[in-house]
Amino acid sequence: MSFCNVCPRSCKVDRKQSIHEKGRAGYCRSGMLPIVSRAALHHWEEPCISGTRGAGTVFFAGCNLSCVYCQNYEISELMQGEEISVERLRQIYFELIAQGAHNIDLVTPTHFTHAIFQSLREPLPVPVVYNCGGYESIHTVAFLRKKIQCWLPDLKYSLREPAARYSDAPDYFEKATAAIEQMYRQTGPYEIGSDGILKKGVLIRHLILPGNLENTKGVLRYVAETFAPGQVLFSLMRQYVPWGRASEFPEINRRLTEEEYNEAKAYMEELGIVDGYTQAADSSDAVYIPAFNGAGVREPSKEEF
């Protein structure tokens, strides 16, 4: 990609000349080859993703957002990970499947779309989940039409001010909702198999931020007004933990209160959003943040013991 426009930032940089510094290699600071920080079974996604055996998660380093509270800060901002070939990426998929993964869960994949497309040149025997921050180009979503069965986008913001302040993306809502609607056009209504695993469809996630209930209510209204019951799944998350640079923003440098979550949940129920998930209070714990230690990235014969 010598003129990158894979995401809404449309940096138009030459990704072949990437240097891991913002301003020199596009917003995501990524080259052509994927940088992977962890590849392992993950048991803490929504039940229709993790199931009983775990999702086959592949965590990519870098990001096209700069969320100040990112729980994956070590890899999204600090770029911890190992650059691998497209062929090695495909091998990782099959290693995870051999371990029992219900699916292949690509976490923060947007900036490596072209490498991922190549790695999925032939279909996999399990669904592929595109687990993204929501700040997507509809053209990139369309490009992946025949490769992705399950879309797992965040819908972080309905308001411009928090989108700009916390993620440097004032146009987030417009871009994310357009992308989500394109995802739905491609998959149609969600389908869950007899094993409880999502086979195709869209699962929209929203993480409630402390002190930002109006932002959350805007997201909930959008979902209720745009999709009918049975069309998409929705996950109302309370797992916020102050992380990354959250300490620089006093208003979000705390956990969510029980009252805040209950108000958001009640509003969701009032709007008639019934397909999906809520979270227990104990989900707000750093223990659920994976160790980004390179597990599963190197070829088995090259792993260090």
Where are the predicted features?
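Conserved radical SAM core fold
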Residues: 113, 135-137, 155-173, 202-204, ...
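Auxiliary Fe-S-binding modules of radical SAM enzymes
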Residues: 1-22, 189-305
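Alpha-helical scaffolding segments of alpha/beta enzyme cores, especially the outer helices
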Residues: 91, 95, 114-118, 122, ...
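A cross-domain feature marking catalytic cores of carbohydrate-active enzymes
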Residues: 60, 108-110, 130-134, 155, ...
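Conserved Radical SAM active-site core
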Residues: 22-24, 28-150, 159-161
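Conserved non-cysteine loop/helix-boundary elements of the Radical SAM core domain that shape
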Residues: 75-88, 107-114, 118, 162-186, ...
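Hydrophobic faces of well-ordered beta-strands that scaffold small-molecule active sites
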Residues: 56, 104, 128-130, 151-153, ...
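Non-cysteine beta-strand/loop elements that form the S-adenosyl-L-methionine
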Residues: 145-160, 232-240
